[in-house]
Amino acid sequence: ERNILTMDMGGTSTDISLLRDGQAMTSNAAEVGDFPVVMPVTGIEAIGAGGGSIAMIDDGVLRIGPQSAGSYPGPACFSRGGTAPTLTDAYLLAGYLPEALLGGKMKLDRTASERAMAPIASGLKSDVFGAADMCVAVASSNMVAGVLPYLARQGVDPEDLTLLVYGGGGGIHGPLLAAELGINRVLVPTSPSTFCAFGGLVSELSHDVMETV
């Protein structure tokens, strides 16, 4: 695959980037803290939708994020004290997640997800399962709203791309995003949750030297 849209979905955000002809696209507009980086960096666009993103009703409108439950307490279904309805809770109630992960070692609390989602369902005049479906749909819309302008700036048609998904939620939401964008091929690497760390270990080092003249 030579033309790839990457999608790294974590707990707080979804980061997208683009490879054309096997080469990562770069950007000259990056900052570390408040300081501009005066050299090309990998062009990454962050979208405020992740597995821990909290659902809320704002003036009658369903919104996902940017607030996040984080890794602790995390989604309500993790049974770590979280009570806010998150996108992960929506995945569980909508049937995208099983009720146990890690070979059954990590149980997900469906009842806690239903309890957390109840205020959202009430605000939407729906049951918790319908509310969960709407949460997933809004998250997809947020992603599409971020991805399409990014690809337009690069002059790329989504239908010409393969979607590479990783991160904790990439394998769940990647196919949904691909369907919205008209992308026909989705790749999920082995161990997607640790794919970034793996890349950091095996990538070749490169050096850029710049001098002001």
What do the PLM-derived regions correspond to, one by one?
Residues 1-213:
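N-terminally biased helix-coil "hinge/interface" segments that flank
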